[in-house]
């Protein structure tokens, strides 16, 4: 994970609840129910994070999910309204293909992936879920893919050449 050079409390973050699940723990006296919430937060300007919260009440689970998501914020490198290059994000059984798109294309993505991309502020992108359709795996795979993105300047710096030489 990249080193954080920003303060999550100074960003104007909005949150989106992706999934709420009722989970059960079986104990000697019967079943104990609680709720699990998968939440994505972002400032719609390049910062995004996802988190899980679990509690007996739904609002408390969502609050915990938001706190967890703020701890896991990443900065997404963007070129205009899309991403710099194609990438496949992987997490567990989840695989998500992310492709840059021309301006005006919109966000072509399903459910959990769309939530992450919209919170990140990406307006034009093509995606395809290749693996598991579990919401948590898809969200984490999307964030893993976004975290691996590099701009042309970063690639040139890593290779020790200029951006002009890199682009031909």
Swiss-Prot record:
<dbReference type="GO" id="GO:0006412">
    <property type="term" value="P:translation"/>
</dbReference>
<dbReference type="GO" id="GO:0019843">
    <property type="term" value="F:rRNA binding"/>
</dbReference>
<comment type="function">
    <text>With S4 and S12 plays an important role in translational accuracy.</text>
</comment>
<dbReference type="InterPro" id="IPR005324">
    <property type="entry name" value="Ribosomal_uS5_C"/>
</dbReference>
<keyword id="KW-0687">Ribonucleoprotein</keyword>
<keyword id="KW-0694">RNA-binding</keyword>
<dbReference type="InterPro" id="IPR005712">
    <property type="entry name" value="Ribosomal_uS5_bac-type"/>
</dbReference>
<feature type="domain" description="S5 DRBM">
    <location>
        <begin position="13"/>
        <end position="76"/>
    </location>
</feature>
<keyword id="KW-0699">rRNA-binding</keyword>
<dbReference type="Pfam" id="PF03719">
    <property type="entry name" value="Ribosomal_S5_C"/>
</dbReference>
<comment type="function">
    <text>Located at the back of the 30S subunit body where it stabilizes the conformation of the head with respect to the body.</text>
</comment>
<comment type="subunit">
    <text>Part of the 30S ribosomal subunit. Contacts proteins S4 and S8.</text>
</comment>
<dbReference type="InterPro" id="IPR000851">
    <property type="entry name" value="Ribosomal_uS5"/>
</dbReference>
<dbReference type="InterPro" id="IPR018192">
    <property type="entry name" value="Ribosomal_uS5_N_CS"/>
</dbReference>
<protein>
    <recommendedName>
        <fullName>Small ribosomal subunit protein uS5</fullName>
    </recommendedName>
</protein>
<dbReference type="InterPro" id="IPR013810">
    <property type="entry name" value="Ribosomal_uS5_N"/>
</dbReference>
<dbReference type="InterPro" id="IPR014721">
    <property type="entry name" value="Ribsml_uS5_D2-typ_fold_subgr"/>
</dbReference>
<dbReference type="GO" id="GO:0003735">
    <property type="term" value="F:structural constituent of ribosome"/>
</dbReference>
<dbReference type="InterPro" id="IPR020568">
    <property type="entry name" value="Ribosomal_Su5_D2-typ_SF"/>
</dbReference>
<dbReference type="Pfam" id="PF00333">
    <property type="entry name" value="Ribosomal_S5"/>
</dbReference>
<comment type="similarity">
    <text>Belongs to the universal ribosomal protein uS5 family.</text>
</comment>
<dbReference type="GO" id="GO:0015935">
    <property type="term" value="C:small ribosomal subunit"/>
</dbReference>
<keyword id="KW-0689">Ribosomal protein</keyword>
């Amino acid at each position: 994970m990249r080193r954080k050079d920003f303060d999550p409390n100074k960003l104007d973050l909005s949150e989106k609840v992706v999934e709420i699940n009722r989970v059960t723990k079986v104990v000697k006296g019967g079943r104990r129910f609680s709720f699990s919430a998968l939440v994505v937060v972002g400032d719609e300007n390049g910062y995004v994070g996802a988190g899980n919260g679990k509690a007996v009440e739904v609002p408390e689970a969502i609050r915990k999910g938001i706190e967890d998501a703020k701890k896991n914020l990443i900065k997404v490198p963007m070129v205009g309204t899309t991403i710099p290059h194609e990438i496949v994000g992987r997490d567990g059984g989840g695989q998500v293909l992310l492709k840059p798109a021309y301006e005006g294309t919109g966000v072509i993505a399903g459910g959990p992936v769309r939530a992450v991309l919209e919170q990140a502020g990406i307006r034009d992108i093509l995606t395809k879920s290749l693996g598991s359709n579990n919401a948590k795996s898809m969200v984490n795979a999307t964030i893993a893919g976004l975290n691996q993105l590099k701009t042309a300047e970063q690639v040139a710096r890593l290779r020790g050449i200029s951006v002009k030489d890199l682009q031909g």
